[in-house]
């Protein structure tokens, strides 16, 4: 009989797909694996370019117990002229469908709302002739929508737009880093690689707050409370006892 581990699924777009890229510095994926090492398997299911329409379509084939971290909205929030845009109302409906599918499978869910966007960094990475189809205010609106769905369905939500901005010292009423009309030299340059995708500082904000949400809302899934699989090496009394521990 195989040694079975429960699973945490990281389900999202390119920000999740890149969450194991060691070039980013601190990485969300390996940090989650380390937190659940020898306790749960952490499965990466990141799909670059996907939006919540795509996610709602494929979630039924991806969900596994015990926990699914759902992070979509970055691509949904692009301007309506772009093919990947998903209107706010449909985005919220898609999140409701995803949460329902996860919960019907007997798993817990944590929603993650999109983080901020940095206009000048995006233009520098893609060239001035590249159509800039995003704004940080649109990203904020979709983060708000994710928070609204989480509150409605009573599932935890990690509002990355606010969490990253607050870590930069921003507060409501301040000028918003990342806007086209503000200087290119701003603190988001240390959190984003190209105006959209994350560097280690942003992934650390995500990790810290996902774990915080799990501890608060699903204490039974707190990695600090879950025992490791199999006895410690110096507690093994015999190979037969070890074999029995797997059964």
Regions found by a protein language model. Name each.
Residues 77-89, 129-135:
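Surface-exposed cleft-lining segments at the edges of enzyme active sites
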Residues 119-162, 200:
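Substrate-gating cap/lid alpha-helix
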Residues 103-109, 155:
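A short helix->loop->beta-strand "cap" motif at the edges of active sites that frequently abuts
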Residues 1-48, 52-66, 171, 219-223, ...:
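Serine-esterase "nucleophile elbow" of acetyl-processing enzymes
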Residues 10, 70, 111-112:
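Structural beta-sheet core signal
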Residues 44-46, 113, 159-162:
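Residue-level recognition of beta-strand->loop/alpha-helix junctions
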Residues 2-7, 148, 152-154, 165-167, ...:
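Conserved catalytic region of serine esterases and O-acyltransferases that act on ester linkages
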Residues 90-93, 97-100, 104, 141-148:
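Alpha-helical scaffolding segments of alpha/beta enzyme cores, especially the outer helices
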């Amino acid at each position: 009989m195989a040694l079975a581990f429960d699973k945490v699924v990281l389900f999202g777009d390119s920000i999740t797909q890149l969450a194991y890229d060691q070039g980013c510095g601190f990485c969300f994926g390996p940090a989650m694996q380390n937190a659940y090492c020898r306790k749960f398997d952490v499965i990466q299911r990141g799909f670059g370019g996907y939006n919540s329409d795509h996610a709602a379509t494929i979630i039924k084939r991806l969900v596994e117990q015990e926990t699914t971290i759902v992070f979509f909205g970055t691509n949904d929030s692009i301007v309506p002229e772009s093919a990947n845009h998903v209107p706010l109302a449909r985005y919220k409906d898609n999140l409701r469908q995803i949460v329902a599918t996860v919960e019907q499978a007997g798993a817990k869910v944590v929603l993650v709302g999109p983080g901020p966007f940095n206009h000048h960094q995006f233009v520098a990475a893609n060239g001035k002739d590249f159509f800039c189809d995003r704004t940080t205010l649109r990203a904020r609106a979709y983060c708000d929508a994710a928070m609204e769905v989480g509150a409605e369905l009573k599932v935890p939500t990690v509002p990355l737009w606010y969490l990253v901005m607050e870590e930069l010292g921003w507060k409501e009423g301040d000028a918003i880093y990342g806007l086209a009309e503000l200087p290119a030299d701003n603190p988001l340059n240390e959190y984003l690689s190209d105006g959209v995708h994350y560097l280690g500082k942003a992934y650390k904000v995500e990790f810290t707050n996902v774990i915080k949400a799990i501890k608060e809302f699903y204490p039974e899934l707190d990695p600090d409370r879950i025992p490791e699989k199999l006895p410690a090496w110096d507690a093994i009394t015999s190979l037969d006892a070890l074999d029995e521990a797997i059964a």
